[in-house]
């Protein structure tokens, strides 16, 4: 995939629609976080992934970390990264 720069530091990309399955509570937290940052869910996910690809934490500021903690509590997301390879579909 090629990309081209277009004025004022913008990066033109080719986005595709996808049907990715995501755990329900994780999705609710992500949607809430996207709303908090006034961005789309897709833009939020792209930013998280680009940070992860470089071994960087996508959220370091206390305000975002507090919002994430609050959203996790509100939506009952009671597990973290340690569970990432143990998630299985419910019946």
Task: Map each language-model feature to its residues.
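Short hydrophobic alpha-helical segments that form membrane-spanning helices or hydrophobic packing faces
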Residues: 30-31, 45
């Amino acid at each position: 995939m090629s990309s081209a720069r277009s004025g004022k530091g913008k990066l033109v990309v080719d986005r595709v629609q996808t049907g990715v399955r995501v755990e329900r509570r994780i999705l609710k937290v992500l949607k809430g976080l996207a709303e908090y940052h006034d961005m789309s869910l897709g833009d939020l996910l792209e930013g998280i992934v680009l940070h992860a690809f470089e071994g960087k934490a996508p959220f370091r500021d206390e305000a975002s970390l507090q919002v994430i903690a609050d959203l996790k509590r509100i939506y009952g997301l009671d597990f973290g990264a340690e569970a990432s390879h143990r998630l299985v579909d419910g019946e």
